[in-house]
From Swiss-Prot:
Its EC number is 3.6.1.-. One of several proteins that assist in the late maturation steps of the functional core of the 30S ribosomal subunit. Helps release RbfA from mature subunits. May play a role in the assembly of ribosomal proteins into the subunit. Circularly permuted GTPase that catalyzes slow GTP hydrolysis, GTPase activity is stimulated by the 30S ribosomal subunit. One of its GO terms (molecular function) is GTPase activity. Its cofactor is Zn(2+). CDD domains: YjeQ_EngC. This is Small ribosomal subunit biogenesis GTPase RsgA. The keyword Ligase does not apply. It comes from Chlorobaculum tepidum (strain ATCC 49652 / DSM 12025 / NBRC 103806 / TLS). InterPro entries: G_CP_dom, NA-bd_OB-fold, P-loop_NTPase, Ribosome_biogen_GTPase_RsgA, RsgA_GTPase_dom.
Amino acid sequence: MKETLSGVVTRVTGASYIVETGDGLKVRCRTVPGTVSENEGSNLVAVGDRVEFRPKASETDMAEGVITRVEERRTALVRRREVRRNRSKEKEQVIVANIDQLVLITSFDDPPFNSRLVDRYLVFAESEKLPLLIVVNKIDLDEEGMVEEDLEVYRQLDCNICLVSAEDGRGIEELRELLRDRVSAFSGHSGVGKSTLINLLVGCEELRTAETSGKTGKGVHTTTSSAMFQLPGGGYVIDTPGIREFNLAGITRENLRFYYTEFLRYMPECTFSSCSHTVEPGCAVIAAVESGSIARERYESYLALLDSLAE
């Protein structure tokens, strides 16, 4: 029997997986019906997964192998998909695994800063106990510092924020330090400059880039598969496909309130322990919004997200 080796999945393209070993060997692998996984209820393999594989004869210049085991994931970035034939059932799609932090790439303009998207990612990061770094690109377009108005509410929440410009290089070194010696998953809508930033950080043109659609104002997707890249000086970044609608797996109408962290200090003062903070009398959260202790835009974001969640 051939020797079993271990490595980390650095790229997923369809049913093909690139696994990199500790000594830098890259092996193109596939799974088989007997592949063992420590993770149930989701796709078998994702970028960032630690796996065991068995080398096999290759007819190409690249080594090939068969994945025999997928180790248990310590963290995962999940997108939830509904099963078409029975919409009451859901299947988790793990986009990346075993990350140290989630990095949300936004932009000041083209497309404009989207606070509702930021709030969705904050909820997800809080639910998964993952640090979230908010990166605002294209600050070269913000000559008057207008983005600070959008960011003030997040600074009050002690969010990690980094302002950068892929165009003139501002903030890139600061961002590099925030990524050093960590496995960071880059996510966000297409068109914000995610691929351009990764190319700058990695030091070569690894990824295609695209402009924002003039018709919709939304990004044109250029990332179609996840991939992990090593950073000079330490650390890894994982590029993930643009997510137009980020689905919050595991978040319900009943538990959403616990992930708006500014609500927590007021919740014990509500008249009803199951208060949804919408219409109930004696709601301390609503009172805090009225007094200005909780930002109204965050509360309105909560209501909108609550309404979007299934009953």
